[in-house]
């Protein structure tokens, strides 16, 4: 189902619900979209998507960082509202991806690098059904400035292609989901490149898929626009998954409609 069609479905079939931010939403549960990464890079075209922001955010996740100062150095401010006065967010995505706490009596500081482990499985055990990364750590959720919205993802190898499915528990359809689609598609392409595979599918599965009440007018404007064909992306191969830089990515043929501004529900 195309993104725009899912939004229309939410607006016409969704349930009015309250939410943590007090804004109010129109919500549907358990929806799915699929994107063929062998043919295109799914960067939304009915409005401008901030590719620089999502690319730097992904690289920041892969660094395993909990502090936004590196993002600020690159003029990316998407996490500013949640950070404390020192720029810290607590043990959010990158920390869980790269250093999930797993203490033992022998090593109380032991951690698990989920990303490295999964990449190793993709390379050496491609039929494994355990190629999973989780950002949802119940023991640390209360320490996070914002609990993970995109909570868990799984990789799958078939016919020399790498696919990925994301489960997103909370889906801000206007501001968050376009970012998440492109970010995990980019990650899948990077992982495939490092493993010597071709990109397959990105499958997005959403739990609470919602349109905030104060985003409805923006969506009505957006849904009146005709989508352009998706662009493609060129990725210069880095020495390792953790050595990519923003300059290694080149989006090709990105034809898009203008930006539509909307408030963030914090």
Curated annotation (Swiss-Prot):
Positions bound to dUMP: 20, 129-130, 169-172, 180, 210-212
Localization: Cytoplasm
Any single Pfam family the record assigns to this protein: Thymidylat_synt
Reactions the enzyme catalyzes: dUMP + (6R)-5,10-methylene-5,6,7,8-tetrahydrofolate = 7,8-dihydrofolate + dTMP
InterPro entries: Thymidate_synth/dCMP_Mease, Thymidate_synth/dCMP_Mease_dom, Thymidate_synth/dCMP_Mease_sf, Thymidylate_synthase, Thymidylate_synthase_AS
GO molecular function ontology, one term from the record: thymidylate synthase activity
Pathway where this protein functions: Pyrimidine metabolism; dTTP biosynthesis
Any single GO BP term: dTTP biosynthetic process
CDD domains per record: TS_Pyrimidine_HMase
Active site: 149 (nucleophile)
EC annotation from Swiss-Prot or TrEMBL: 2.1.1.45
Sorted UniProt keywords: Cytoplasm, Methyltransferase, Nucleotide biosynthesis, Transferase
EC class of the enzyme, as a word: transferase
Organism domain of life: Bacteria
Amino acids binding (6R)-5,10-methylene-5,6,7,8-tetrahydrofolate: 172, 265
A GO cellular component annotation in the UniProt record: cytosol
Oligomer and partners: Homodimer.
Family: Belongs to the thymidylate synthase family. Bacterial-type ThyA subfamily.
Function summary: Catalyzes the reductive methylation of 2'-deoxyuridine-5'-monophosphate (dUMP) to 2'-deoxythymidine-5'-monophosphate (dTMP) while utilizing 5,10-methylenetetrahydrofolate (mTHF) as the methyl donor and reductant in the reaction, yielding dihydrofolate (DHF) as a by-product. This enzymatic reaction provides an intracellular de novo source of dTMP, an essential precursor for DNA biosynthesis.
Listed name of the protein: Thymidylate synthase
């Amino acid at each position: 189902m195309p993104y725009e069609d899912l939004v229309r479905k939410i607006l016409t079939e969704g349930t009015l619900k309250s939410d943590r931010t007090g804004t109010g939403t129109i919500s549907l549960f358990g929806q799915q979209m699929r994107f063929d990464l062998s043919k295109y890079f799914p960067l939304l075209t009915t409005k401008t998507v901030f590719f620089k922001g999502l690319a730097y955010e992904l690289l920041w996740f892969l660094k395993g960082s909990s502090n936004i100062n590196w993002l600020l150095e690159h003029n990316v401010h998407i996490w500013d509202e949640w950070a404390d006065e020192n720029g810290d967010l607590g043990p959010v995505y990158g920390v869980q991806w790269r250093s999930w706490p797993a203490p033992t009596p022998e090593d109380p500081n032991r951690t698990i690098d989920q990303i490295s482990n999964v990449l190793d499985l993709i390379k050496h055990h491609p039929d494994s059904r355990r190629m999973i990364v989780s950002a949802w750590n119940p023991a640390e959720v209360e320490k996070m400035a914002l609990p993970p919205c995109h909570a868990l993802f799984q990789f799958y190898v078939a016919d020399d292609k790498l696919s990925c499915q994301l489960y997103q528990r909370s889906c801000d359809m206007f501001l968050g989901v376009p970012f998440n689609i492109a970010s995990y598609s980019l990650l899948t392409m990077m992982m495939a490149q490092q493993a010597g595979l071709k990109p397959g599918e990105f499958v997005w599965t959403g739990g609470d898929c919602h349109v905030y009440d104060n985003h409805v007018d923006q969506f009505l404007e957006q849904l009146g626009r005709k989508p352009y064909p998706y662009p493609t992306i060129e990725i210069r191969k880095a020495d390792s998954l953790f050595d990519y830089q923003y300059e290694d990515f080149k989006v090709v043929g990105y034809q898009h409609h203008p930006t539509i501004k909307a408030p963030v529900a914090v």
